[in-house]
Amino acid sequence: KIKNLYFCFIYQFPIMKNIFLSMLVLAIITSCSKDQVDLTVFNPELTIVENLNNDVSILDLIEAVGLEALYGLEFGGGFIFNVNSTSGELMVARDYSIIGGVAWGDHFDLNTGSTIGDGLESTQLIVDRNADDNSLVLGGFEFGSDNYAFKIALDLELDGFDDWFIPSSGSLEAIYNNVHMYGEGDFDESLIYWSSTKDGYFPYVMFFNFESWGGQAFAGSCLDANGLVIARKF
C-alpha cells in the first residue's frame, strides 16, 4: 500500500499539475484574445442598437447597414429620426405628454427657424424672450409662470439626459415621416404637438393623425395648451 501511494504521488500528481498548468495557459490566451476584440468595430452578429451601445461610429453603421436602417430605433432616450451622414450626428425624439397639455408661454412677436436642427437654438431663444416683460410689447402679454412648454423641456432631466428641447416644425415632420409612419415611436395621434417654430405671433404645431393634417405643420395659437414632443441631438 505504501508503495502504491508512492507511485501515485510520483506519477499522478505531476500529470495533474501539468494538466492544470496547460488549462491555465489556455485560459490566459483565450482571455487575451477576447481583450483584443475591438467592440467599436461593427459586428454584423449584433443588432444595430447593440452596436450603438458599443460605441460603433455612426458613419461605420451607415456604411454597413444604410442610413434608413437607423430610423425609428430607440436609442439615447428617444427614437432616431434624423442622421447626419457627414458628421454622424443623431437626433432622437419622444412623446412627453404624460404631464398633460401645456401652454406656449408669453405672447410676443418672434421668428424662429423651421429646419431640422433649429430646435435647440429656438427653444433657448423662446425661453430667453419669455424672461422679458412682454406685457410692455405691442400685442404682448405675460403668461405668468415657468410652467410652459419650452422652459419645461430646457430644464428637463429624463433617463439620464438633460439636453432636451422642443423640435422645429421641420423636425416634427421628419419624426412623422421617418418614425411614426412606420409604426415606431410613442407619439399620440389624438394630440396637437408644439414645435419651436414661430412666425411672428403664430407658433407652428402638428398632428400625428394622418386624417387631421398629419405630418404637416401649420400655424396655431399661443393661447392653446398642447402636447410635447421633446428631442435631443448628439
For every predicted segment, state its role:
Residues 1-15:
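Short, Lys/Arg-enriched N-terminal segments with co-localized hydrophobic residues
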Residues 93, 166-167:
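GIY-YIG nuclease signature motif recognition
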Residues 19-29:
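Sec-dependent N-terminal signal peptides
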Residues 88-90, 164, 191:
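Structural motif
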Residues 39-49, 161-162, 169-234:
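C-terminal, surface-exposed recognition/capping segments
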Residues 15-19, 33-34:
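Positively charged n-region of N-terminal signal peptides that target proteins for export
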Residues 32-159, 221-234:
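Short, compositionally biased
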